């Protein structure tokens, strides 16, 4: 006879069997689904996660404020004097197909000078630090960026993930994607990626073989408000010698292995448009694959980067040229040992991003102005070895030199 106690035991036994069978089936199904996911799908998922992550912003005091869940990573320009607590005005969608590429980029990635610097650190390499193939030589350098920047989002983007990330960010500008996909050399894509990611998301880009010696919170002088700076660059080369052209592309060359920027900065718009248009021109002429190593610096590297920056400094769209004493040239920066400022751009001396090179006036690694150390791994062997007034890049302004 089946007693109440036996009934309870039997029921418990049956429920246990059902639970175990269900759990086993669920695990088998999950394993089956996981095994069918391609590497591309995984990369796409990672790219989407990175692109949708909201990085915290920081100010000069080290205080950080995160984005609210409803706030987009790229905000529209607020009216002058508007409080930062207001929600950005939603932009009306419009047809951008008839706009120039520069204007399309300005529409997609509007520039807000008064916002804080995004707390992103972007690096690229063949593997992520989680991979055994990452390389022990790079681990101390990569780790230094996280150690010096607690609270920042630090991403090492692989080549495959970079493709999906660019497709996510630049879906509305197919010309840019066509140029990125068409580039025949990894170094060209690596150069292009840094400008693209900073234009779209802002933050810091630095090569994988760089060591952070000081936090980015210390890069901008205390006397300069962070809401008046949108781009921080450093001197790569200042060859004060008669034969400088035999060794370097420009008399003053700005480095692009480390750049800090707010998203949408005009310099980034111009460099992205320039590289895109030149790439597509070469592609249609059938000469894109014929790029010598010593021409990379002029195509995507520090030479064209330097040219774009000087063009910006002398552009009447952003500066009041009528009251200018003349064009800003390399002479304004040669021999500098302290930061200078042109408009919303802070220019750091050669010691800041090139300490220890033992030439061109650069200090050593322990110099107070040394911020980033570069190991020059995988670098092209050729060519890479008194503040100015603050002016808003959003409207023409004077460029008078200050002491």
Regions flagged by a language model, labelled:
Residues 191-203:
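Small-residue hinge/turn detector
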